[in-house]
Design a protein with these regions (language model features):
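A conserved mid-protein helix/loop that constitutes part of the nucleotide-sugar donor-binding site
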Residues: 16-21, 199, 203-222, 328
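Glycosyltransferase donor-sugar binding loop
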Residues: 35-40, 171, 204, 231-245
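Donor nucleotide-sugar binding/catalytic pocket of nucleotide-sugar-dependent glycosyltransferases
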Residues: 54-55, 134-186
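Nucleotide-activated donor-binding/catalytic signature segment of Leloir-type glycosyltransferases, i.e.
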Residues: 236, 246-263
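Aromatic "clamp/platform" in nucleotide-sugar-dependent glycosyltransferases that forms part
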Residues: 264, 283
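Short hydrophobic beta-strand element within catalytic cores of glycosyltransferases
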Residues: 291, 300-303
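Conserved acidic donor-binding segment of nucleotide-sugar-dependent glycosyltransferases
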Residues: 315-316, 320-327, 336-341
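A short, well-ordered alpha-helix in the C-terminal region of glycosyltransferases
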Residues: 342-357, 366-368
Length: 376
């Protein structure tokens, strides 16, 4: 009989996007149950991955009463399912499921830390975040930081004294190199968005403050004034409530003739192929998939010196690394990328650097090996 494992995230989109294909792979070796808040993405996961799913409502934000209800629901679920392992990702699912699994005495309790919020927070908020992550670690038997930067921050802030393990070279699920490739079909689609004799900078992600959008738009505005043969393509949704960009930034995005906002896109590959440079000036990350994806599509990347990004990108090899929240450094990096010879040199190494370290099936092999080591 296969051992049972439960994989959790707070919202179903995380299971859908971050663990694509991984749950199906694991189901060949274990009985897999996927758990998250309800939603159409959870139904999508069940059909695509071929695993059983269970909906347990969980709030992303702090909500003591609702969190308590979610905790009791998870305890009831774990009592009923009696899994060998509970493995969570995302903060709230991690906190609640590790507590519930500890109460239920589940033998193997794993939490994967992706992006950490507390290193860039301050005051009471930072103390609360550190406390909740410390509780998660106290209840877990095994802790998996997504990369070296997350590993370093967990140690630096003394979140736990337990051993920390990174799977492979980092990242949750690796990169599907067959999907993220310049196939003839993608090249054809990209022609709709390409502009000749224009250097296109592309950003993919939420259009929010802590992705560095204010600095990016301001730096590009200056760049375009000096070099009119430039364009900025933004792929991703605005967020009105959580961390919105400045009003003047949004106005510039909507009105500037050389800035094209594409909104949410199910397939970002044509936009990457239609661009010359990928720009990701985020303030904080765990291990950004989108930088892996841009590199796999052959783009040199400009990234900030933050966790994950500075592990994927090597200075002057497949991109350049700049200080976070530094508009002038961003401007200078974008200006440097206008040199075609420099771009091509970095682009040649972009895909090989990703393929050698983050190929998906290689990471799956390492994850499965790690799971097997816990079976005892």
């Amino acid at each position: 009989m296969k051992k049972k494992i439960i994989r959790l995230s707070t919202i179903p989109m995380s299971l859908d996007i971050l663990l694509q294909g991984q749950l199906r792979m694991l189901s060949e070796h274990y009985e897999v149950v996927a758990v998250s808040s309800p939603g159409s993405d959870l139904e999508k996961v069940e059909k695509r991955e071929g695993v059983r799913t269970v909906a347990v409502p969980m709030e992303r934000q702090i909500s003591p009463l609702r969190d308590l209800v979610s905790l009791f629901r998870l305890i009831r679920l774990f009592h009923r399912e009696k899994p060998w392992m509970v493995h969570s990702l995302t903060p709230k699912a991690g906190l609640l499921s590790m507590m519930a699994a500890w109460i239920c005495r589940i033998p193997v309790r794993i939490h994967s830390f992706t992006g950490l919020v507390f290193p860039t927070a301050s005051g009471l908020k930072q103390k609360i975040l550190i406390a909740t992550d410390s509780i998660t670690c106290a209840c877990a038997t095994t802790i998996l930081p997504e990369g070296k930067g997350v590993h370093r921050d967990l140690e630096r802030f003394q979140i736990t004294s337990k051993p920390l393990n990174i799977i492979g070279n980092g990242n949750i699920n690796g990169i599907d190199l067959e999907f993220f490739d310049q196939t003839p079909a993608i090249l054809e689609q990209a022609e709709k968005y390409r502009k000749e004799e224009v250097v296109t900078f592309c950003f993919v992600g939420r259009i929010v403050r802590d992705k560095g959008i204010n600095e990016l738009v301001s730096a590009f505005q200056r760049l375009h004034q000096a070099y009119p043969n430039t364009r900025l393509v933004l792929v991703g949704p605005f967020e009105e409530q959580l961390d919105p960009v400045l009003p003047e930034t949004r106005q510039m995005i909507e009105q500037h003739t050389a800035i094209e906002w594409m909104g949410w896109q199910d397939d970002i590959r044509p936009f990457l192929v239609a661009s010359e440079v990928f720009v990701f000036p985020s303030y904080r990350e765990g291990f950004p998939n989108v930088v892996l994806q841009a590199g796999a599509m052959g783009l040199p990347c400009i990234v900030t010196d933050i966790n994950g990004s500075n592990e994927i990108i090597s200075e002057s090899i497949n991109g350049c690394i700049i200080p976070s929240q530094n508009e002038q450094a961003l401007y200078e990096a974008m200006e440097k990328m206008l040199n075609q010879e420099e771009r091509q040199k970095l682009a040649q190494q972009a895909r090989p650097q990703i393929a050698n370290r983050y190929e998906r099936k290689a990471l799956w092999k390492e994850l499965l090996k790690f799971y097997r080591s816990l079976e005892g």
